[in-house]
């Protein structure tokens, strides 16, 4: 009790408020009607878990590639447009995944602009004349969600690269080792894993995208069992499986950053120096950064802007202004509240 003080009271209240909904769900899952457990295990639950794992693996892998590669290129190399791309790469995080799912489906489906253009160019008359991947599929969901979630990994990995002491990079150069593989990645592991944990938690909690793409995941299963079978206990039981996933992710993130400490004892330059590359190298760096930006922001926003222009005459501007101000007020209020609570908890913890 030596660490107990007056600030511990509000922290305890906040913790109780946060944990109460979780306890309510666990109570409903294990102390409510448990007769549905055997039915769930023998029918839908294995499929929900498998699809969730596939989605997590796909989104996590692609987000890692996009996030880490862009973070390294932006931090390490000097090329045209770097200062703009450094912040532009965060823009996809502002677009909800389900909105991009709607936009991509309208653009790439059989009746959409892209396939229509291909049929006009090559003279194809029906879907039997050619093959085109179905955007409303597991692969499509992985692409859509990765294109908006990679900024979590990009932001945290770039912060790790920037805060790694320059002496570590210099040492790798002296011994002729690959700086990226042997220094940057191992030392950025806590940041990478923290970003990956956020990406995966966003993935398993997503409802809009998986519902629109008709993917049977645990999150969609919660709503199907709750509303379709009118079983709150069954929905709570599926939610408890989601809790297991979240706890595993938090544990992995903790293990990744445990004992990861280093200190720069020398004075002088403490951050990585930008490296000049050839013209071809600059082009490659530019393409690496443009690909996720195009996939996650430029293409979907262009499609949405086209919708706006085509339906400009029927737009209800009063409704848009009202909902815009409501969204801004809600986001500012929530972010301010979360920031204050987080600062309070950090101060008390330290």
Task: Show which residues each predicted segment covers.
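Short alpha-helical segment immediately N-terminal to, or the first helix within
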Residues: 38-39, 160-161, 211-212, 224-225, ...
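Glycine-rich helix-loop "coupling/hinge" segments at transmembrane-helix boundaries
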Residues: 204-230
């Amino acid at each position: 009790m030596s660490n107990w003080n007056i600030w511990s009271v509000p922290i305890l209240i906040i913790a109780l408020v946060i944990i109460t909904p979780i306890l309510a769900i666990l109570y409903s899952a294990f102390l409510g009607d448990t007769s549905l457990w055997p039915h769930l295990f023998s029918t839908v639950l294995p499929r929900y878990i498998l699809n969730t794992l596939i989605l997590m693996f796909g989104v996590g892998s692609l987000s890692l590639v996009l996030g880490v590669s862009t973070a390294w290129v932006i931090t390490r190399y000097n090329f045209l447009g770097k200062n703009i791309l450094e912040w532009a790469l965060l823009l996809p995080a502002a677009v909800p995944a389900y909105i991009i799912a709607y936009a991509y489906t309208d653009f790439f489906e059989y009746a959409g602009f892209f396939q229509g253009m291909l049929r006009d160019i090559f003279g194809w008359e029906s879907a039997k004349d050619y093959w085109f991947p179905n955007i409303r599929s597991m692969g499509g969901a992985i692409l859509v969600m990765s294109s908006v979630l990679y900024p979590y990994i990009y932001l945290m990995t770039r912060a790790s690269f920037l805060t790694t002491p320059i002496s570590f990079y210099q040492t790798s150069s002296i011994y002729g080792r690959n700086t990226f593989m042997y220094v940057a990645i191992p030392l950025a592991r806590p940041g990478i894993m923290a970003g990956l944990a956020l990406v995966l938690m966003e993935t398993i909690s997503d409802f809009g995208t998986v519902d629109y793409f008709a993917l049977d995941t645990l999150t969609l299963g919660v709503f199907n069992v709750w509303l379709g079978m009118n079983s709150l206990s069954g929905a709570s039981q599926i939610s408890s499986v989601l809790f297991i996933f979240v706890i595993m992710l938090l544990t992995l993130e903790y293990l990744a950053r445990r004992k990861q400490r280093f200190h720069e004892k020398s004075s002088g330059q403490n951050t990585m120096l930008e490296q000049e590359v050839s013209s071809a190298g600059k082009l490659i760096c530019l393409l690496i950064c443009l690909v996720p930006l195009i996939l996650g922001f430029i293409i979907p926003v262009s499609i949405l802007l086209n919708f706006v222009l085509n339906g400009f005459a029927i737009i209800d501007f009063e409704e848009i202004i009202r909902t815009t101000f409501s969204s801004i007020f809600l986001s500012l209020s929530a972010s301010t509240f979360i920031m204050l609570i987080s600062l309070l908890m950090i101060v008390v913890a330290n």
